[in-house]
A protein has these predicted regions:
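N-terminal secretory/membrane-targeting segments
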Residues: 1-2, 6-117, 138-157, 192-196, ...
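Solvent-exposed soluble domains appended to multi-pass membrane proteins
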Residues: 106-115, 123-124, 129-381
Length: 381
């Protein structure tokens, strides 16, 4: 895209300006030695970088670009984000080749006609089971409702592309089914290609089956550019915090509480008659950065076991926020249980919280996953 091309062009123009306008060496250049040394330097750098990638000392996939710059340094990260722009266009990519592929799919069974259920996706900000953190002592289960649903309905671990940040990338993968590994390191499709074009997505596919598609987010519409991105993803409507009557229901960090989403989801379901709805909901209450100082209000749930007092304060704040989010999950499922139409509700966390967790800190030994549960009011088995 334009943004991707601009970086190498800017880099090249800056280098050219330095060559033309920069100070000149007055001595005699020893080209016989200097040129081979420069070439050898490039070859050595490329070889060492490739070896480091093979040995997993370096990575060309950044789950959190800020952490990547801390781990691998500025020169490597800058270089890899400039020159690695993701998967290349296949050599045989053409209209003729696509038509040939389409012909091979002609014998697939057709989608059965009938009544389809409403589909709700609920992406919960930084939501996961803190009891998986092996050094924490928590006074009571912070997510009893979500845990009960995981036992009673289809559930498991949900692989996500980021850690501690990158909500929009989990969102992108969930809406499109495309992996971020096809993009450049640290790239946000919301900030690059989707600003210019559309792509295949759940709203477009479900639209062919008669679905109306809605996006809901209890944060401002311009966050991650969603206001302009969601139309390109095929959503018919987008309701952001600015249009919610209870927008002022804030947590101590100023994020709108997730309980305001229940009525907004039901409004979307009620907005269409004789038509199923796809409602993609993004929560925000669990967002950081979490306070290192203790809060004035006494928390319902206490947390101990963190290596420092400041980290313990962060965990206690976080645990009590996801406890409120868990109460919201119960309120939502209770309301949907009595809804007169069929509903399938998919709930999952977008990524782990920004707590500096390592694989040794969590019982499941993997940082790129949260939990999911698929609930319904239809008695599915």
């Amino acid at each position: 895209g334009v943004q991707t091309c601009a970086l190498p062009i800017f880099f090249a123009l800056t280098l050219l300006a330095l060559i033309v306008k920069g100070p000149k060496f007055k001595g005699k250049l020893k080209y016989r030695w200097n040129i081979p040394l420069v070439l050898a330097g490039f070859v050595l750098f490329a070889g060492v970088t490739q070896l480091a990638l093979e040995k997993r000392v370096l990575s060309n996939y950044f789950g959190n670009i800020a952490f990547a710059y801390e781990d691998y340094g500025y020169p490597y990260c800058l270089g890899v984000t400039i020159f690695d722009t993701g998967i290349s266009c296949p050599r045989d990519y053409s209209e003729k080749e696509i038509k040939r592929i389409e012909k091979t799919e002609e014998n697939l069974p057709e989608t059965r006609e009938g009544e389809y259920p409403n589909i709700i996706f609920l992406q919960l900000e930084s939501f996961f089971d803190p009891e998986l953190v092996n050094y924490l002592e928590i006074s009571e289960d912070p997510i009893p409702n979500f845990r009960k649903l995981m036992k009673e309905y289809t559930s498991g671990y949900y692989k996500v592309p980021s850690v501690g940040a990158g909500t929009a990338n989990t969102e992108f993968e969930s809406i499109t089914g495309m992996s971020l590994r096809y993009f450049g390191p640290g790239e946000y499709p919301y900030k690059s290609i989707l600003k210019e074009t559309t792509c295949e997505s759940a709203p477009y596919v479900l639209g062919e089956l008669g679905y109306s598609s809605h996006a809901i987010h209890n944060n401002e519409a311009n966050f991650y550019g969603r206001r302009s991105i969601f139309p390109n993803l095929g959503f018919d409507t987008f309701t952001s915090a600015e249009y919610m009557p209870e927008e002022d229901d804030k947590n101590p960090l100023g994020w709108t509480r997730d309980r305001v989403l229940t009525d907004e989801i039901l409004k979307c379901l009620d907005s269409t008659e004789d038509q199923p709805d796809y409602v993609y909901t993004i929560s925000v209450q669990g967002h950081g950065a979490y306070p290192e100082e203790p809060e004035l209000e006494e928390h319902e749930i206490t947390v101990t076991g963190s290596p420092t007092a400041s980290k313990n304060n962060q965990w206690e704040y976080y645990v009590n926020q996801i406890h409120e989010m868990d109460n919201f999950v119960k309120e939502l499922t209770d309301r949907l249980e009595d809804y007169p139409e069929d509903v399938v509700l998919v709930m999952y966390g977008d990524h782990l919280p920004t707590m500096g967790l390592t694989v040794e800190d969590v019982d499941n030994k993997y940082l790129f996953q949260t939990q999911y549960v698929i609930w319904d009011n239809m008695g599915l088995e």
